[in-house]
Design a protein with these regions (language model features):
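A near-ubiquitous, low-amplitude feature marking generic local secondary-structure context
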Residues: 3-7, 31, 35, 81-85, ...
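Conserved SAM-binding loop
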Residues: 21-122, 206-211
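A broad, low-specificity signal for short, low-complexity segments enriched in glycine/proline
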Residues: 11-17, 35, 43-46, 71, ...
């Protein structure tokens, strides 16, 4: 099975928020309320506007929320038309509980992205350097942040196919994101990935779930 792919490059949260606003413009424009889970400095709100409510433990959110302790209990069932949670769940021990909460507070759409922790570049790094990246391993001091989960894009796909079926949800869109820089090296890798259609080269998996 080959996944559709997107190749837009972003270096930071601001560029990722712009990618979200552009890629999901139709769904966001149809929504009167948006919840950004893990908003950091509310960058999506700065782009989309006041209909976005940002929550996070750090940064400059509208509400400070510790997802490990409070979950999303301050919000009502179906309170938001569009719920965004990108590059957050892999940091949480209560992964499954938070997904249930994302579904609960959404009235229609839920956008989730997760890293493809087993992309080909990580595998090569482990093979030749013995390192899996900054969010893994055994640092000398207790880290402020780390990934609690290690999964591939196929693991994520199987999980959401099962989850959607069990909860009578629809998968509206999903794609793999290949985030390569615009340097000559990045352009070369991008060209090779496109030519060979390599799913394993993607750095993240994105899925838009719709409630029936």
């Amino acid at each position: 099975m080959r996944f559709p792919k997107k190749y837009e490059h972003f270096d930071n949260r601001e560029e990722r928020a712009a990618f979200i606003a552009e890629t999901f413009e139709k769904e966001i424009s149809q929504s009167s309320s948006v919840l950004d889970v893990g908003c950091d400095y509310n960058t999506l709100k700065k782009i989309v506007g006041s209909k976005v409510t940002g929550i996070d433990l750090y940064g400059d959110p509208d509400y400070k929320v510790d997802f490990e302790k409070e979950k999303l209990l301050r919000f009502k069932d179906g309170e938001f038309d569009f719920v965004v949670c990108t590059e957050v769940l892999e940091h949480l021990e209560n992964f499954h509980e938070i997904i249930d909460e994302l579904i609960r507070v959404s009235n229609r759409y839920i956008l989730i992205s997760l890293p493809n922790c087993m992309d080909i570049f990580t595998r090569l790094n482990i093979l030749f350097r013995g390192k899996a990246g900054k969010f893994y391993g055994l640092p000398f001091e207790k880290p402020a942040d780390r990934h609690r989960w290690f999964f591939s894009h196929t693991d994520i796909e199987r999980f959401f196919q099962h989850y959607a079926s069990r909860h009578e949800l629809s998968i509206a869109r999903r794609f793999l994101h290949c985030n390569f820089s615009h340097t000559w090296r990045g352009n070369l890798v991008r060209a090779c990935v496109k030519f060979f259609n390599l799913d394993s080269a993607a750095q993240s998996y994105w899925i838009l779930i719709e409630k029936n």
